[in-house]
Amino acid sequence: MIVNECLFFTIALCDAAEPWQLGFQDAATPMMQGIIDLHHDILFFLILILVFVLWILVRALWHFYYKKNPIPQRIVHGTTIEILWTIFPSIILMFIAIPSFALLYSMDEVVVDPAMTLKAIGHQWYWTYEYSDYNSSDEQSLTFDSYMIPEDDLELGQLRLLEVDNRVVVPVKTNLRLIVTSADVLHSWAVPSLGVKCDAVPGRLNQISMLVQREGVYYGQCSEICGTNHAFMPIVIEAVSATDYTNWVSNLFIPPTS
């Protein structure tokens, strides 16, 4: 393929799953960056709520311990505190909801005039890719299947259960339209670094938009249980410069010489 990524480079950028990983993979699209930012914003409010609740709990245990207060206080009504614990949670939910809805709607937006259209078809248990812009005839089409490389055939530096024989090559900083469907059962096309997860449903076309911002190799997997070999349907996206992408396409259409 065009870019030969070593294992160190892939792990350093965190574009593939790692053992014992707890955080996100590095964002390669505005969509994924928005997801990470939203997570951090919500986590800020969660930490504040956690600290406040723990403070109230510790204070109650300390000041209202039964040995210090043998006779419990009988508080049955408090208008002020009831108003406060209704208003403040509502404000917090509003601060969480507004950016989350904005991100949700932006993820559903479809580019009106994409520079490139890619179709992914799920099978048991591999993916078929069609570059629709080049499929002008049966003699000239850009379609291929992508299977997982068996463990015994892996080369040094390749990732177990994540490498494929044919990678999907896309240009960076280009508006892409991805059409996802299935030829048999439910699948799901998901690449964490790109912030993409689209269900592949038989008889239905789902589409999403992508804008890969940096070159690299991005790994994903089928994220919908689809049978015995569900875990062996990896996805590999190789993002290259526009020049390298054009050369890659041109080389595929060069007729073989005898």
Swiss-Prot record:
Note on cofactor: Binds a dinuclear copper A center per subunit.
Alphabetically ordered keywords of this record: Copper, Electron transport, Magnesium, Membrane, Metal-binding, Mitochondrion, Mitochondrion inner membrane, Respiratory chain, Translocase, Transmembrane, Transmembrane helix, Transport
Catalysed reaction equations from the record: 4 Fe(II)-[cytochrome c] + O2 + 8 H(+)(in) = 4 Fe(III)-[cytochrome c] + 2 H2O + 4 H(+)(out)
Residues involved in Cu cation A2 binding: 222, 224, 226, 230
Gene3D superfamilies: 1.10.287.90, Cupredoxins - blue copper proteins
One Pfam family of this chain: COX2_TM
Segments in the Mitochondrial intermembrane topological domain: 1-41, 105-258
Metal-binding among keywords: yes
EC class (word): translocase
CDD domains: CcO_II_C (cd13912)
Compartment(s) where it occurs, according to its Swiss-Prot or TrEMBL record: Mitochondrion inner membrane
Coiled coil stretches, renumbered: none
InterPro entries to which the protein is assigned, alphabetical: CcO_II, CcO_II-like_C, CcO_II_C, Copper_CuA, Cupredoxin, Cyt_c_oxidase_su2, Cyt_c_oxidase_su2_TM_dom, Cyt_c_oxidase_su2_TM_sf
GO CC list: mitochondrial inner membrane
Molecular functions (GO terms): copper ion binding; cytochrome-c oxidase activity
Binding positions for Mg(2+) per the UniProt entry: 224
4Fe-4S in keyword set: no
Single GO biological process annotation from the record: ATP synthesis coupled electron transport
Annotated membrane topology: Multi-pass membrane protein
TM annotation in the entry: 42-58, 83-104
Family membership: Belongs to the cytochrome c oxidase subunit 2 family.
Role of this protein: Component of the cytochrome c oxidase, the last enzyme in the mitochondrial electron transport chain which drives oxidative phosphorylation. The respiratory chain contains 3 multisubunit complexes succinate dehydrogenase (complex II, CII), ubiquinol-cytochrome c oxidoreductase (cytochrome b-c1 complex, complex III, CIII) and cytochrome c oxidase (complex IV, CIV), that cooperate to transfer electrons derived from NADH and succinate to molecular oxygen, creating an electrochemical gradient over the inner membrane that drives transmembrane transport and the ATP synthase.
Assembly, per entry: Component of the cytochrome c oxidase (complex IV, CIV), a multisubunit enzyme composed of a catalytic core of 3 subunits and several supernumerary subunits. The complex exists as a monomer or a dimer and forms supercomplexes (SCs) in the inner mitochondrial membrane with ubiquinol-cytochrome c oxidoreductase (cytochrome b-c1 complex, complex III, CIII).
Identification of the protein by name: Cytochrome c oxidase subunit 2
Phylogenetic classification of the source organism: Eukaryota, Viridiplantae, Streptophyta, Embryophyta, Tracheophyta
